[in-house]
């Protein structure tokens, strides 16, 4: 089976330039119209990690989401944006990162994820609690940010879909599966399989290296990447960064589960990975444990509810941060 990964040098988030780059990126894949049909409800799933570090390249740039939304609308789709941040609401994090003016100009709603229990074909994870909004969407477009990650080495397309696990269920998974990096990586891969994004577009124009996902440093990489196969996308990005896949739990799980593409299966309709090699990508200085103990889960839960139900409403009421 051919697995196409479209790769493009892109240096700018300026609206016109970015829109042109995305058209070029998607054209070999059939354009947005190959993924979105008139009337489709299309979930745009960015990385909305935090509202506390704007400008540090911790989240998918709002310009990327807006440009993709415009292409979806041109194809006749009805885009909406959603995520389940670790702390606070999707709307609150989006507002702090400058999303609202761009989304409002295109009349793009923001949804807060609600959970449902869904069966999988995995022997290890019979059911997963996932976002109803993602599972019920006609089309899911995954919009990850290229970042290092202090627990999982890297966060790319597969890890971004963990944001489709609603609320504090993510913290529970860190407690339940985090003692075994192999099991946690497999859970992330099974989540990605269940969500089954129709298209993944990676924002690597400005990336985040070092002690990510939010305490590292911005780095200009100048890369956009897209594929209908999120596992092929991550495989290729790992190669571009010259990283050992065995050190990345999601990549190791993909290999064990037979999801990594072979060289014969991969095709690159635009740039080839060897033309885009990134030297000296910085990984976290020290990897932190994946597992969360019960006290940390309780603190995290309290912080999440405080931000979502006290701090954010107070900000709306008073107009102050």
From Swiss-Prot:
One GO term describing the cellular component: plasma membrane-derived thylakoid membrane
Key word Aminoacyl-tRNA synthetase present: no
Transmembrane segments: none
The protein's name in its UniProt record: Thylakoid-associated protein sll1697
Lineage: Bacteria, Bacillati, Cyanobacteriota, Cyanophyceae, Synechococcales
InterPro entries linked to this entry: DUF362 (IPR007160)
Key word Membrane present: yes
Subcellular location(s) per record: Cellular thylakoid membrane
Membrane topology listed for this record: Peripheral membrane protein
Annotated Pfam families: DUF362
Keyword vocabulary terms for this entry: Membrane, Thylakoid
Organism: Synechocystis sp. (strain ATCC 27184 / PCC 6803 / Kazusa)
Taxonomy, superkingdom: Bacteria
């Amino acid at each position: 089976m051919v697995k196409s990964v479209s790769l493009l040098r892109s240096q700018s988030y300026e609206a016109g330039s970015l829109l042109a780059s995305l058209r070029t990126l998607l054209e070999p894949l059939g354009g947005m119209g190959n993924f979105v049909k008139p009337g489709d409800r299309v979930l745009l799933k960015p990385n909305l990690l935090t509202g506390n570090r704007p400008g540090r390249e911790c989240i998918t740039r709002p310009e990327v989401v807006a440009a993709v939304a415009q292409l979806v609308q041109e194809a006749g789709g009805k885009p909406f944006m959603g995520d389940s941040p670790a702390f606070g609401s999707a709307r609150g994090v989006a507002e702090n990162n400058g999303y609202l003016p761009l989304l409002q100009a295109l009349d793009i709603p923001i949804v807060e994820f609600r959970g449902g229990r869904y069966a999988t074909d995995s022997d290890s994870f019979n059911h997963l609690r996932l976002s109803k909004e993602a599972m019920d969407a006609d089309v899911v477009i995954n919009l990850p940010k290229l970042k290092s990650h202090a627990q999982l080495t890297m966060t790319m397309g597969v890890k971004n879909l963990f944001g489709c696990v609603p609320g504090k269920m993510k913290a529970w998974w860190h407690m339940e599966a985090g003692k075994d990096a192999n099991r946690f990586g497999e859970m992330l891969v099974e989540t990605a399989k269940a969500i089954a994004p129709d298209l993944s577009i990676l924002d690597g124009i400005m990336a985040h290296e070092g002690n990510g996902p939010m305490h590292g440093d911005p780095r200009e990489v100048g890369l956009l990447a897209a594929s209908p196969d999120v596992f092929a996308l991550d495989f290729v990005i790992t190669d571009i960064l010259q990283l050992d896949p065995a050190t990345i739990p999601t990549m190791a799980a993909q290999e064990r589960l037979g999801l990594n593409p072979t060289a014969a299966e991969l095709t690159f309709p635009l740039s080839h990975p060897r033309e885009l090699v990134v030297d000296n990508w910085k990984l976290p200085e020290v990897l932190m444990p994946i597992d969360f103990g019960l006290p940390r889960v309780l603190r995290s839960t309290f912080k999440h509810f405080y931000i979502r139900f006290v701090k954010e409403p107070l900000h709306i009421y008073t107009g102050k941060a």
